[in-house]
Amino acid sequence: MRLSRLILPLIALSALAGCATNAPAPTANVAAPGPAPAPMPGYDWFLNRDGPEAILAYGVANSDEVKLHLRCKAGSGALELTAASEKPGREIHLESGGDTERYPAASEPAGVHDGELLTALAKSKDPVFQRFRRLGWIASWSDDERHIYAAHPAAKAGIEQFFIVCG
């Protein structure tokens, strides 16, 4: 009789012990990030300070050829975006290192060159800008075409300074 009384608790105990064992943790199947896009010869990011305002522009030095323009007032955290476009649009679509954002935009004729200028508002803390800050490149999507704006090594300090100033 004693043995039958012990069998039931032993079975229950071994069942509990089986439930308590840890299964091996699943391994993450994360691919290593690809290499950063190469900077385009003749184009780069340029930082300009004018009083409390900071401007970060991607284009050709000392010219009107600017592809993307970010502006902020010091400490505001608010960005005004201006992007060159071949035709009128309703959004500025940006990507950096897998983070993407679409900003509703106003469109107006460029005046200085053929095409349009799209303007939108954003926040410097948006993930796409924080990734740009870390990686040194951002891409603009227009008509299913990706235009990459990668910094040359010397310009990366200006990108960091811009985001420090903007807050």
Residue ranges and their predicted role:
Residues R90-R102:
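Extended low-complexity, serine/threonine- and proline-enriched intrinsically disordered segments
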Residues A15-G18:
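C-terminal motif of bacterial Sec signal peptides marking the signal peptidase cleavage site
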Residues G59-R90:
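Short, surface-exposed binding/anchoring microloops in extracellular/periplasmic proteins
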Residues P52-A61, L79-A83, E116-A122:
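Generic recognition of long tandem-repeat/solenoid scaffolds
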Residues A28-G51:
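Post-signal peptide N-terminal segment of mature Sec-exported envelope proteins
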Residues A20-A28:
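Bacterial lipoprotein signal-peptidase II cleavage site
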Residues M1-L8:
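Bacterial N-terminal signal peptides that target proteins for export
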